[in-house]
Structures are given as structure tokens and as C-alpha cells.
Amino acid sequence: MVATNKFDLTVQSPGRINLIGEHIDYNGGHVLPAAINLNITIGFKKKTGSVCHITSKSTDGFLFNLEEPIKPKSNNHWGNYVIGVIDGILKLRPNLLSAFDCEIESNLPIGSGISSSAALECGIAFGLNELFNLDLTDLDRIKIAQKAEHDFVGTKCGIMDQFAVTMGQKKKLILLNCETLDYQLIPADINPYKIVLLNTNVAHNLASSEYNLRREDCEKALKIIQSHFPEYKHLAEVPLDIIKTLEKEFDEVVFKRATYVVEEENRTQMASKVIQNGE
């Protein structure tokens, strides 16, 4: 996150990539994301009154009133990412926000898998924290942004996107344990190679996609495993041989989901070691 001096405050909030560890964050395993050099720019300006005006250079703006209950807008309205964060801040820091306007501009492709939604959520949280001296920690803001996605958008996401956007640093990968939230910054020294992002122009929306269904499948798998081995709290920590032993208790799709999660967790930890060893 970077704060500059335009408006009362201008924030640049980056997108993110994830090298490996897909669908692992909500299964309590390890992921290996990094912030990227594309971002959302948000300009904030304080004002009198209680009505806030949010504008965007790419879509219609909207208004909300801080003195009225904050409720989700209609399905898929982009404003839910913003007002969900506002709701979370008001619950943690009641009566500390006053009216503001903000203008949003982005060079992050929307729905392209580089977390434009998390960039918006975390940028709003960071900016308001700075603007109103809310004394929210990094982790406070990360969790506010994640909860906004759960409660206002309808995506039961893990914590990786918001964590990577908030904690990412230039030329660093983040090895994140999504259960404990312990993390390690790993130098992304891959010369003479570069990571290149390709925009396929295929858009997706996690809230209306199979994302939530995949999470439900993983939860079904864990519930079956816990009926035999209650010591396991997360799917990513279950040994592969246990999943294979219980194969007949899973339907075909759930078995594939569970197997993938455990194998992907192993691949992620192996990949992080290879990168750290410069191999």
C-alpha cells in the first residue's frame, strides 16, 4: 500500500498473483502469492454532513448515508465491496468515521483472477484508516475486507487475497500459512526470468461461480474425515493416505477435491523450498 498527497489522501492498492496454492487458503494450508504492479487508485476527500459519494471512472457511482443502517445493495453491485468495508469499520470503530467522497480509478482487469475486489476493499480500508486515524492494524483491515466479501458480496473466500494485497512488498513472495496467518517474505529473485501476466479476456465472478460450491465440497470431505479422525481441523493438514483409506465414503467429486487439496499443499511447500534455495 502506498499513500500519496492528491486529494486529502490518495491510495494505490495493488492486485495480486498466486504462484501456487490454489483453493488452499480456505482449507487451512499454505499459499504463495505476491502483489503486482497493477493497482486501483483511490482518492479520498473529507466533507461535512453524513452522505458519502463514491465515484468510479469506469462505472456508475453511488451514495450512502453514514447515519443510516448499512445494507448490501442488489446482487453483483460493485458498491458492496465498499459498503461492506464501511460496515466492518463502523462495527470496530463506531462514531469515528465522518462523511467523505472518494474517486476510484483502476488499471486492474476486473474478473481476471488478480483480485481487483480485494484491492478495492483493502484500499478503502487502508485509506479510511489513514484519513480518520482509526488505529486499525494490518490484520484488522485484512479481516474487515474478507468479512465484507463474505457478508456483502456473497463469496466465502479465504484470506489470501486480502493478505497479499495488504502485506505484499516489491519483489517479494509471501509464504502464508492460512490457518495461523504466520508468513514469510521470500525474495523473488528469478533472474533472468520474469513473471508475465496474460489477460485472456475471460471474466469470472466468484460470487456467482462454482467457487462457493468447491468450498462446500471441501467442507463435506473434512466432515467425513473428522468423523474418523477428529484431530484434523483443516483439510490441507490431512495425510493423503487417510483420504485414500476413506475413498469409498466420498462421492467422486468430493474425493477429487480432497485429494487435490492435500497434493497442492505438498506442492506449495516444495515450491517455496525450491525458490528459497535458488533452484
List the model feature ranges, each with a label.
Residues 1-118, 125-138, 143, 147, ...:
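ATP-binding N-lobe of GHMP and related small-molecule kinases
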Residues 1-16, 41-75, 172-279:
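C-terminal nucleotide
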Residues 113-119, 244-249:
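Short glycine/threonine-rich loop-to-helix capping motif typified by GTGT followed
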Residues 115-120, 137, 155, 165-168, ...:
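Short, contiguous, pocket-lining structural segments
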Residues 152:
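Short arginine-rich
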